[in-house]
Amino acid sequence: MFLYALRRLLLAIPLLIGITFISFLVIHLAPGTPGEIQTGDLSIQSDKEIQKLLIELYDLDKPLHVQYWKWLTRIVRLDFGKSFSPDARPVLQKIGERLPITLLLNVVEMLIIVALAVPIGVYSATRQYSMFDKVTTVFVFVGFATPDFWLALLLMILFGVQLGWLPISGLRSLNWEYLSFWRQQWDFAGHLLLPILVATFGGLAGFSRYMRQSMLEVVRQDYIQSARAKGLPERVVIGKHALRNAMLPIVTVLGLSLPGLIGGSIIVESIFAIPGMGQLMVQAVFERDYPVIMGNLVIVSTLTLVANLLADVTYSFVDPRIRVGARRGRR
């Protein structure tokens, strides 16, 4: 297992380099430069000399492969550079301020999705074509078809504007500093409720469908029929024998879902004005802040590769056949 994990880590290094290289080229080939953005986007009032100085300052006059090599040598030393924005703050500092919020949103979202999708999928599979199964099927189609931004706007209008129950932007109220400790926590949770609800809606629809399909495949297996023929209670058959095997594909899906969750957080954070990685990424793209964009991509790509590795390792732990196959392969 250790050698397998080490091999996967070594294979992830060239993959990460390839991701960053392609992203670096695409970003720099996009129209507009940081100098043009900061001086007015080539308007009549723009100072050409200032743009030239900014290009030289940022080494943007060098060939792309030279720029990428210089950036890569800094990344190896964990030096993400400084932002091109007027504050010129270190990229790691800006990311460090935003990353915890994005991780909190995604972790809570994933926990809610798993906690709800597993029982929904199991109940739908064990009662196939029942009214509950039909209702959840409609919910799945609605969840897949509903854009996050459209759902976010509807919930903001309903709960924030018309009913006034929940805040619709930011993480804290204006009077947050004057609230008691527990009121501050309640205020913070209230600001996160709508974003988490929006982010969870589509994922819950997909995961419940995956769980249902996986459970249907398992309950049709011979060993499940044998367990029922032995007179075991249905609760034991489903909970002890079927559920564990039905969860195996879900482990892989969870690892592969991380990029989509982070990508979805870009939309949610932008709409709800949440100061997370997604909002930072959008601002950096509009400002052509190359160091911040690449820093975000490195962090997100690394998290994705690590999540996929953890999913594979977890899969081997819950499925003994993987470990046996790996031992036979070494022989």
Q: Where are these predicted regions, by residue range?
A:
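Hydrophobic alpha-helical transmembrane segments
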Residues: 44-61, 137-146, 194-199, 236-253
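Hydrophobic alpha-helical segments of integral membrane proteins
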Residues: 9, 50, 54, 64-80, ...
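An internal, D/E-rich "acidic patch" concept
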Residues: 60-118
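Residue-level signal for discrete positions within transmembrane alpha-helices
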Residues: 12, 98, 102, 138-145, ...
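Alpha-helical transmembrane segments of integral membrane proteins
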Residues: 2-3, 95, 99-132, 161, ...
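Membrane-water interface segments at the C-terminal ends of transmembrane alpha-helices
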Residues: 22-29, 58, 73, 139-169, ...
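N-terminal signal-anchor/signal peptide hydrophobic helix marking the start
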Residues: 6-15
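Hydrophobic alpha-helical transmembrane segments of membrane transport/permease proteins
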Residues: 16-69, 163-184
